[in-house]
Amino acid sequence: MEKYEVNKTLELFETKIKDLENALDLDAINNRLKEIEPIMANPNFWNDSNQAKKISQELNQLTEKKQTITSIQNQYEDALMWLEEAKEGTESWDILEAEIDSLQKKISEFEIEVLLNGEYDHNNAILELHPGAGGTESMDWCGILMRMYERFAGYKGYKVEILNYLAGEEAGVKSVTLRISGPYAYGNLKSERGVHRLVRISPFDSNKRRHTSFVSCDVAPEIDETSEVELKDDDIRMDTFQSSGAGGQSVNTTYSAVRLTHIPTGIVVNIQNERSQIKNKEAAMQILKSKLIQKELEEKQAKLNALKGEKSDIGWGSQIRSYVFQPYQMVKDHRTNYEVGNIQSVMDGDIDGFINAYLKSKAYE
């Protein structure tokens, strides 16, 4: 790296750090930390465990953000110091370049974290996949996407639980509901909400023709038990049925699986992962609340003409992203134009680039 390149890079860092400081509003963070301190010092703080947990999480998140921006500021000052002392071709110059590389990574990662500032971005995510028209080919595509999100969750250190699973008759998945748990799981995955289109030569077609398949991905923030969402008994219809496992095998012979229908909105939730009907109903109620929150978020954003992760009907022209396996290899997001040629890497869960491009595009609208 030449000296003029170093100077330009450090100037860019200075601008980005100022933007981060403004976005964070450090004064507001410090004021909130001062408010939290006496609340947590109260001897009765833990009497309400749910509220105490929420405040503790808020404290940790604010403290972490403050520490991160301070660390970035200090590392930037260190880089300026090395620039004054270092000479090209020397060991000190190598140290400066390493410092710049490290700082670049920290700033890029923190930029994304700062963008995840929505009310529910820090929540766990409820992710559902449903194949569109296309039979076995679409169901196989649904199974491939399920694996992609499981791999992505693994890279992030997230926990994945299958809440509802219905296998395809020949291959793939008819429908699946996943709970993905971890910091900012919803904030990261909300960009995946929409229709995903696959173009490939179908392994199920003996004539080796090219097929187009669609899968709808729905994502909602998981709402905890302290949520103020109210559900009236008269607004909910509950149906029970026998749960089934992968391949259609019966898990048990009792009617433990639960389907809840929210009559005013038509939202339907199916849960069958637990052996107890009571537990399945509790889980279904929680997910129903999550979906109602997601619907409320959409309505608010629609009024502002900024609906994030808009989901369309499953069909031609409605997709948010295309995955082309043949005649060439390319994954392209139609909202941001971000594209990747290494399709295997994407199918193995490397979707950070798509997520980051989406978050940045929404921030700069």
Curated annotation (Swiss-Prot):
One of its GO terms (cellular component) is cytoplasm. The modification N5-methylglutamine is found at Q249. InterPro entries: PCRF, Pep_chain_release_fac_I, Pep_chain_release_fac_I_sf, PrfB. It is found in: Cytoplasm. Disulfide bonds: none annotated. One of its GO terms (molecular function) is translation release factor activity, codon specific. Its main location: cytoplasm. Keywords: Cytoplasm, Methylation, Protein biosynthesis. Methylated by PrmC. Methylation increases the termination efficiency of RF2. It holds the Pfam family PCRF. NCBIfam families: prfB (TIGR00020). PANTHER family: CLASS I PEPTIDE CHAIN RELEASE FACTOR, PEPTIDE CHAIN RELEASE FACTOR 2. Belongs to the prokaryotic/mitochondrial release factor family. This is Peptide chain release factor 2. It comes from Acholeplasma laidlawii (strain PG-8A). The gene is prfB.
